[in-house]
């Protein structure tokens, strides 16, 4: 039994040129926190940029914050919710289909 060299590259399927397997996701532009901006529950205008339309806290992937900034932001959002400066949930009215 003789061992022959097998060319794997010859049998590898080639992807069409210029095509991607998965489309790229479009994220919202990150909001940059300036050095003079303080992450505080009273700063509602800054906090509003870090919650979604459904009043959920956005992830670090979307906001591009550091670990420390994300933790401070989530604590500030939770405090603002308790003091009713921000809503816990956003109630949307659904249209009836019939």
UniProtKB/Swiss-Prot annotation:
The gene is rps18. The keyword Plastid applies. Residues 1-26 are annotated as: Disordered. Its main location: plastid. Residues 1-13 have a biased composition (Basic and acidic residues). One of its GO terms (biological process) is translation. The keyword Ribonucleoprotein applies. It is found in: Plastid, Chloroplast. InterPro entries: Ribosomal_bS18, Ribosomal_bS18_sf. This is Small ribosomal subunit protein bS18c. It comes from Gnetum parvifolium (Small-leaved jointfir). HAMAP family: Ribosomal_bS18 (MF_00270). Part of the 30S ribosomal subunit. One of its GO terms (cellular component) is chloroplast. Belongs to the bacterial ribosomal protein bS18 family. Disulfide bonds: none annotated. GO terms for molecular function: small ribosomal subunit rRNA binding; structural constituent of ribosome. Keywords: Chloroplast, Plastid, Ribonucleoprotein, Ribosomal protein, RNA-binding, rRNA-binding.
């Amino acid at each position: 039994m003789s061992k022959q060299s097998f060319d794997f590259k010859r049998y590898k399927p080639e992807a069409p040129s210029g095509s991607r397997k998965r489309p790229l996701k479009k994220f919202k532009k990150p909001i940059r926190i300036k050095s003079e901006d303080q992450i505080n529950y009273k700063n509602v205008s800054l906090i509003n940029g870090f919650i979604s339309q459904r009043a959920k806290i956005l992830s670090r992937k979307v906001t591009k914050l550091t670990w420390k900034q994300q933790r401070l932001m989530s604590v500030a959002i939770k405090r603002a919710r308790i003091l009713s400066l921000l809503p816990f949930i956003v109630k949307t009215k659904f249209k009836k289909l019939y």
